[in-house]
């Protein structure tokens, strides 16, 4: 089952548009899922706004979700930013703390940590720091 946060208009040249679900409709999607067939795991991908991030975090807590995977899709393959500036901090504060597994790529790791990833060792350092928080 899926809950759709946004639709994108994109191709190999870039993203030309993003149409987000409203927080109310997105919450209705999550409620429909969690009150029917309870998911064994939750995978979170692109979430563009802080309002939708808050909606997800609230639902995960309310429904006591387990096995949460956060793939913080923040930049498209073509380099277009997919998350609003004010949403990245909320993602760190509300979703990263709930996730069992976080799978950022290098550009996403740099956005989330504010540091430059220049080696495999630096990735391990960021992983260790995140685990300590």
What are these regions (language model features)?
Residues 44, 49-125:
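Conserved beta-alpha-beta core of the PfkB/ribokinase-like small-molecule kinase fold
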Residues 1-70, 74-77, 81:
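Conserved N-terminal subdomain of the carbohydrate kinase-like
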Residues 126-131:
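Conserved small/polar residues in nucleotide/adenosyl-binding loops
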């Amino acid at each position: 089952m899926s809950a759709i946060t946004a639709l994108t208009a994109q191709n190999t040249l870039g993203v030309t548009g993003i149409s987000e679900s409203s927080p109310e409709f997105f919450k209705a999607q999550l409620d429909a899922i969690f009150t029917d067939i309870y998911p064994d795991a939750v995978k979170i991908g692109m979430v563009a706004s802080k309002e939708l991030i808050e909606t997800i975090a609230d639902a995960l807590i309310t429904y006591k979700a387990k096995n949460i995977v956060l793939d913080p899709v923040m930049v498209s393959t073509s380099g277009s930013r997919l998350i609003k500036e004010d949403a990245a901090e909320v993602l760190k504060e509300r979703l990263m703390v709930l996730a069992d597994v976080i799978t950022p790529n290098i550009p996403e790791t740099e956005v989330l940590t504010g540091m430059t990833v220049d080696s495999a060792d630096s990735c391990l350092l960021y992983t260790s720091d995140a685990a300590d928080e």
